[in-house]
Design a protein with these regions (language model features):
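Intrinsically disordered, low-complexity segments enriched in small/polar residues
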Residues: 5, 16, 27, 51-52, ...
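Short, Lys/Arg-enriched N-terminal segments with co-localized hydrophobic residues
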Residues: 8-32
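Gram-negative bacterial Sec-dependent N-terminal signal peptides
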Residues: 32-52
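A general "mature secreted/periplasmic domain" signal
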Residues: 53-198, 218-226, 234-319
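Surface beta-strand/loop "capping" patches
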Residues: 202-228
Length: 319
């Protein structure tokens, strides 16, 4: 079906694509570079004693050496936050709970990858997750609900960036805690980027799905109930934003995008998503799950035109 090959998408990094950027965004980028320089000096200072033969007992955890931390801006506090959490909710720093990866600079602003991975041994089950791109016309990328079979959350997808922006993840745990992490990404023009395929072809193939069982053992390890496994779900859909023009004209394409997605296995929920057009064209989700021995995985999606897309994928049953 011509889908992108599976891999660790978070390695993508290249030059900034040609697109409109406001002076405010350039100012943000310059501020970020200053912060990066200060961070580099701080890390260097901490490592000097060890290099000079002094004590090396103190080492920064990997996630303390962030290359693209969020930058200050009014949009989250003044506009977006109220749509994500209640005013009285205390947002805790989530760096100890989850690892969140997004590129410093994206090669393609229409397909910016991100990965959310729960840190091992935290003892907290994440039940909900909201992904936000602060400066997008539709900032809330998606609201996810996770079933117990998702275990320690490990999920990847791709999003659009309209201008340079923070991307942040807010998660809720089973015990009632709310945590947030975020990164700043240099990418712009993704919400108005040209549709990659012929419109007639895009509409004709809309709703087609593919599920990859990511068995990295090459089939050498048989399935077993209780095992942690990985899969990649790919769905054909143009995810029209309403900001894209028909090729060769100034006529805008009407918005149309997937707004709900539900994945189940043997009748048990893996994850459910309510989303918007900030998700990239032809959505792709790589996720880990706990095998419950079921022989099938079901996917159901709906879009803003009321279309329903459903498919059942056979699985090798667990032992």
């Amino acid at each position: 079906m011509g889908y992108p090959s599976q891999g660790h998408l978070t390695t993508i990094s290249s030059t900034f694509p040609c697109s409109f950027v406001t002076k405010r965004q350039l100012k943000k980028g310059n501020a970020m570079m200053k912060r990066l320089a200060l961070s580099a000096l701080a890390v260097a200072a901490l490592t000097v004693p060890a290099l000079a033969g002094g004590s090396s007992a103190f080492t920064l955890p990997p996630y303390a050496q962030l290359q693209n931390p969020m930058i200050d801006g009014p949009t989250w506090d003044e506009v977006v936050r109220a749509d994500v959490v209640e005013d009285d909710v205390f947002l805790q720093d989530g760096e100890d709970l989850i690892s969140f990866d997004a590129p410093i600079t994206a090669f393609d602003a229409a397909t910016v990858p991100f990965t959310v991975s729960q840190r091992a041994g935290m003892g907290e089950r994440i039940t909900k997750m909201t992904v936000i791109v602060d400066e997008n016309p539709m900032p809330i990328v998606g609201e996810f609900e996770f079933g117990p079979l998702m275990g320690d959350i490990d999920i990847e997808s791709r999003v659009r960036f309209d201008v340079f922006s923070n991307i942040r993840v807010v998660v809720e745990t089973e015990t009632g805690g709310t945590y947030m992490v975020g990164r700043f990404v240099e990418a712009a023009g993704g919400c108005s980027a040209t549709v990659t395929r012929d419109l007639d072809v895009a509409l004709a193939t809309m709703g087609k799905m593919k599920l990859k069982d990511l068995d990295f053992s090459g089939g050498a390890t048989p399935r077993a109930s209780g095992d942690v496994r990985q899969a990649q779900l790919m769905i054909r859909h143009p995810m029209f934003t309403g900001m894209q023009a028909h090729k060769g004209t100034l006529n805008m394409i009407d918005p149309r995008f997937i707004e709900t997605l539900e994945v189940t296995m043997g009748g048990e929920l893996l994850f459910k998503m309510t989303g918007g057009f900030s998700i990239s064209e032809d959505p792709s989700f790589r996720f880990s799950y706990i095998d419950n021995g079921s022989q099938e995985m079901k996917v159901r999606a709906t879009d803003t035109d009321g279309a329903v897309f459903e498919q059942t994928f056979p699985l090798n049953p667990g032992a």
